[in-house]
Amino acid sequence: MLARRLIPCLDVRDGRVVKGVRFRDHEDVGDIVDLARRYAREGADELVFYDIAASARGRTVEPEWVSAVARELDIPFCVAGGIRSVDDARARLFAGADKISVNTPALEDPTIIDRLAAEFGSQCVVLGVDSRMIEGAWRVHQYTGDPDKSFAGHRRTLDWIGEGVDRGAGEVVLNCMDQDGVRDGYDIAQLEAARAMCSTPLIASGGAGRKEHFKSVFELAKVDGALAASVFHKGVIEIGQLKSWLDGEGIRVRP
C-alpha cells in the first residue's frame, strides 16, 4: 500500500466553512480560503470540500470559491455538492479542482458515475457515501446536509460501494454518520467490511479525536486515507505533528 493520506474535510455552507456533530447543529469555523491555505501550510496531503447544502437546495457547488481555493493551493483538492452532469463537473475541474465527488446525485442517477469516469477518468471520480446502521444493516443516506430532507434510502452501504466502483468511481469516501464530530474513533467494523470488498482507494471519515484513532484506522481497517474535520479546525491535532507521530509508530505517511 502507498503512503497513507491525511485529509482535512471542509464542509461549506453559504460561503463559509462549518462543522456539525452527526451532520447536525453546524457552527461556523472560518473562511474557506484561509483554512485551505492553513492546511496546505501544515502539511495536509489533500483537501476535500463538501458544499453540504447544494443538493438539498437544488444547486451546484459554486465555481467562484473553487477558483479562489485553486489560486492558493499547491496540493490536490476534491469538491462535492450537487454535481449532476458532465458539464457541472467540467466547470469545477476547469475552475481548479482535481477531483469531483458525487453522493446524493449518484443515488438519484447512478449513471452519472459512468459518465464522469468516461469523460474525465476514474482517477477524477470519488464516490461519497453517508452511512448509518438502520435495523441491523448499514444503509446509505441522502441529502445529509439538510436535517429536514435527509433520509435513508433502500440501498445497503456495501452494495452501493460495490456498484459505484463497478461503474467507475476511482475512490470511495465512507462517511460514518454516527461517528461524525463526536471524536471517539472511526467506525472500524464498518470500514473493515468496506475494505474487504472495495478494490479502489478507501478513505475513512467520521470519528477522529486523538492521534491514536488515526493509527487504529490505518492498521485495522487498512484504509488508504483518513478524513478529519473538527480536530483539525479547532487545533486539537496539528497535521505535521500527527505525521511525525504516525511515522514513529510505523505507519507510512507522506512527508
From Swiss-Prot:
Active site: D11, D130
Signal peptide: none
Pfam families reported for this sequence: His_biosynth
GO CC aspect terms: cytoplasm
GO molecular function, one term: lyase activity
Primary localization: cytoplasm
Keywords: Amino-acid biosynthesis, Cytoplasm, Histidine biosynthesis, Lyase
Major enzyme class: lyase
UniProt similarity note: Belongs to the HisA/HisF family.
Subunit structure comment from the entry: Heterodimer of HisH and HisF.
Pathway entry: Amino-acid biosynthesis; L-histidine biosynthesis; L-histidine from 5-phospho-alpha-D-ribose 1-diphosphate: step 5/9
Organism classification: Bacteria, Pseudomonadati, Pseudomonadota, Alphaproteobacteria, Maricaulales
GO BP annotations listed: L-histidine biosynthetic process
NCBIfam families: hisF
Catalytic activity entry: 5-[(5-phospho-1-deoxy-D-ribulos-1-ylimino)methylamino]-1-(5-phospho-beta-D-ribosyl)imidazole-4-carboxamide + L-glutamine = D-erythro-1-(imidazol-4-yl)glycerol 3-phosphate + 5-amino-1-(5-phospho-beta-D-ribosyl)imidazole-4-carboxamide + L-glutamate + H(+)
Function: IGPS catalyzes the conversion of PRFAR and glutamine to IGP, AICAR and glutamate. The HisF subunit catalyzes the cyclization activity that produces IGP and AICAR from PRFAR using the ammonia provided by the HisH subunit.
Organism field: Maricaulis maris (strain MCS10) (Caulobacter maris)
This enzyme's EC code(s): 4.3.2.10
Protein name (record): Imidazole glycerol phosphate synthase subunit HisF
Subcellular localization(s) per the UniProt record: Cytoplasm
